[in-house]
């Protein structure tokens, strides 16, 4: 990389026994710094920290930086572009190469979850939520959508009772991944996916209403 009079050097001093989450938090703080100072081209020079066996400092650092860069701005008429180029300078260890795809998948999954949680209730209603989850089939997942008729047949009366106050229908979505051929018992994750509806009655005080749109965050996290 080229060094000129406009080059800014940032030195990061690391403490011993860093956890992966510490490195990711550091990457997030670094993103705040470069955004505040409008830096557009970043070169990260790897040092001794990256050379430790089994430690992927750069991978976790950039992962934290990318997670911090998330913005939900699809409804803004004027979108501020944060185009930042990151160059990695130096030899990367095998951990970095091996983890690149894993971090990419984690980032895409996290951003998908954040998009779901950030959508307003008049956009992400139950049928729209179920529709978006069916898109996961392209990754080889088995996605099954149970509508009102199927839920009634299966005896999901409590779930249907909650949805009676809405003009929209209720759904239950199951997502299955059978990537392990082991005969051991499968793991099941259950997330609450109650979508906020602006109609009907609410027993909650007004000051708690604005957070109701996050009532489906549990299911979004599971997804």
Model-derived segments and their meaning:
Residues 133, 187-189, 202-223:
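Alpha-helical metal-binding/catalytic segments enriched in His/Glu/Asp
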């Amino acid at each position: 990389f080229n060094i000129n009079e406009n080059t800014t050097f940032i030195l990061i001093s690391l403490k011993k026994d860093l956890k992966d989450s510490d490195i990711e938090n550091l990457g997030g703080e670094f993103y705040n710094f470069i955004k505040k100072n409008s830096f557009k081209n970043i070169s990260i020079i790897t040092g001794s920290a990256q050379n430790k066996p089994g430690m992927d400092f750069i991978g976790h650092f950039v992962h934290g930086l990318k997670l911090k860069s998330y913005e939900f701005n699809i409804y803004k008429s004027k979108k501020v572009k944060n185009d930042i180029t990151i160059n990695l300078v130096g030899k990367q260890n095998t951990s970095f190469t091996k983890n690149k795809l894993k971090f990419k998948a984690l980032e895409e999954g996290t951003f998908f979850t954040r998009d779901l949680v950030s959508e307003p209730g008049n956009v992400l209603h139950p049928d729209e939520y179920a529709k978006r989850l069916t898109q996961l089939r392209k990754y080889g997942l088995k996605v099954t959508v149970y509508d009102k008729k199927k839920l009634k047949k299966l005896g999901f009366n409590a779930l249907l009772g909650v949805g009676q106050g809405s003009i929209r229908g209720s759904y239950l979505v199951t997502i299955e991944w059978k990537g392990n051929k082991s005969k051991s018992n499968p793991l099941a994750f259950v997330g609450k996916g109650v979508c906020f509806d602006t109609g009907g009655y609410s027993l909650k005080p007004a000051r708690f209403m604005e957070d109701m749109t996050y009532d489906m965050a549990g299911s979004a996290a599971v997804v």
